[in-house]
C-alpha cells in the first residue's frame, strides 16, 4: 500500500495504489460548512460516511448505475477507479429546502412535482456558482451529449435512491452528485453519497438526518449519521 497523496479535499484523501487506475480513498472526520469557512472534527464521521457510501454505491451498482466504487477495504477506506472529475456539482431536488427556498421565495418542505436537476460550477474560489447548460459549454466543462448523459444518470439515481430511502422511512429532500471520466471516456458516478451530500428528513418527525444538523447547530452529527447507517443496514439485510 502506497501513501503517495494524489488529492485532498474537505472530507477525503485520495492515494495511489500499486494497481494502475485504482485509487485508495480515506474518509476524514472533518465536517465543513460555508464552503470550508467553518470546520470541525467529529470522531467516527469518516467511518460512517465510508460505510454509508459503500452500501449506497453497491445498491446503485445492482440497479445498473455505474460508478467509480470498487470495494471498501477498511472502516474508513475504499478502493475506487481513477477518473478525471468533471468540475460540476449536480444537485437533484425533490423538496424545497436550503438555497432553493431563498432563491425561489418558497417555504422549506414544499414538494416539487418533478425533480429539479441543477448544475453548479465546482470552483471553491467562486463559491461554486449556479450555472446553466450554456455556461457549461462555454467553460468547456462537458459536451452537450455528456450533459444529457449526466442529467439522465442523475434522474435515474434519484429514482433508485428514493425507493431505498422510502424503505428507511426517510424523505430524500435533495442531494449532490459528482461524475468523472474514466480512461476510455466513459462517464461514471464518483465522489460519495452520504449525509454529507444529501438532505434527509425522517418521514414522520421531519427530523434532519444530515449535515444540516452541523450547519444549523440543531443536533449531534455523529448520532444522526449513525441513525442513517443503522436504517440502511436494516433494509439491506
UniProtKB/Swiss-Prot annotation:
Give the EC number(s) under which this enzyme is classified: 6.3.2.6
Show the catalytic activity.
Answer: 5-amino-1-(5-phospho-D-ribosyl)imidazole-4-carboxylate + L-aspartate + ATP = (2S)-2-[5-amino-1-(5-phospho-beta-D-ribosyl)imidazole-4-carboxamido]succinate + ADP + phosphate + 2 H(+)
Q: Which pathway does this chain act in?
A: Purine metabolism; IMP biosynthesis via de novo pathway; 5-amino-1-(5-phospho-D-ribosyl)imidazole-4-carboxamide from 5-amino-1-(5-phospho-D-ribosyl)imidazole-4-carboxylate: step 1/2
Q: Does the keyword Metal-binding apply?
A: no
Q: Which residues form the signal peptide?
A: none
Q: Does the keyword field hold tRNA-binding? A: no
Q: Which InterPro entries match?
A: SAICAR_synt/ADE2_N, SAICAR_synt_PurC, SAICAR_synth, SAICAR_synthetase, SAICAR_synthetase_CS
Q: Which SUPFAM superfamilies match?
A: SAICAR synthase-like
A GO molecular function assigned to this protein is: ATP binding
One Pfam family name is: SAICAR_synt
User: From which domain of life does this come?
Assistant: Bacteria
BP GO annotations: 'de novo' IMP biosynthetic process; cobalamin biosynthetic process
Q: What UniProt keywords apply to this chain's record, in alphabetical order?
A: ATP-binding, Ligase, Nucleotide-binding, Purine biosynthesis
Top enzyme class, one word, equals: ligase
The family line of this record is: Belongs to the SAICAR synthetase family.
The name of this protein is: Phosphoribosylaminoimidazole-succinocarboxamide synthase
Amino acid at each position: 500500500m502506497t501513501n503517495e497523496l494524489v488529492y485532498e479535499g474537505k472530507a477525503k484523501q485520495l492515494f495511489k495504489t500499486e494497481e494502475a487506475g485504482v485509487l485508495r480513498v480515506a474518509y476524514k472526520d472533518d465536517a465543513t460548512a460555508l464552503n470550508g469557512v467553518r470546520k470541525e472534527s467529529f470522531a467516527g464521521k469518516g467511518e460512517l460516511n465510508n460505510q454509508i457510501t459503500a452500501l449506497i454505491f453497491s445498491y446503485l451498482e445492482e440497479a445498473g448505475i455505474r460508478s467509480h466504487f470498487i470495494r471498501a477495504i477498511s472502516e474508513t477506506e475504499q478502493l475506487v477507479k481513477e477518473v478525471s472529475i468533471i468540475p460540476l456539482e449536480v444537485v437533484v431536488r425533490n423538496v424545497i429546502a436550503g438555497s432553493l427556498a431563498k432563491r425561489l421565495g418558497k417555504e422549506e418542505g414544499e414538494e416539487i412535482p418533478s425533480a429539479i436537476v441543477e448544475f453548479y460550477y465546482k470552483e471553491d474560489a467562486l463559491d461554486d456558482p449556479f450555472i446553466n447548460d450554456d455556461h457549461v459549454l462555454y467553460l468547456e466543462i462537458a459536451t452537450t451529449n455528456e450533459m444529457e448523459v449526466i442529467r439522465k444518470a442523475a434522474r435515474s439515481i434519484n429514482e433508485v435512491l428514493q425507493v431505498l430511502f422510502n424503505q428507511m422511512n426517510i424523505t430524500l429532500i435533495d442531494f449532490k452528485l459528482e461524475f468523472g471520466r474514466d480512461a476510455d471516456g466513459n462517464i461514471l458516478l464518483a465522489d460519495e453519497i452520504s449525509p454529507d451530500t444529501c438532505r434527509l428528513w425522517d418521514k414522520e418527525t421531519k427530523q434532519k438526518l444530515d449535515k444540516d444538523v452541523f450547519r444549523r447547530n440543531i443536533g449531534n452529527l455523529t448520532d444522526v449519521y449513525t441513525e442513517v447507517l443503522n436504517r440502511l443496514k436494516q433494509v439491506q439485510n
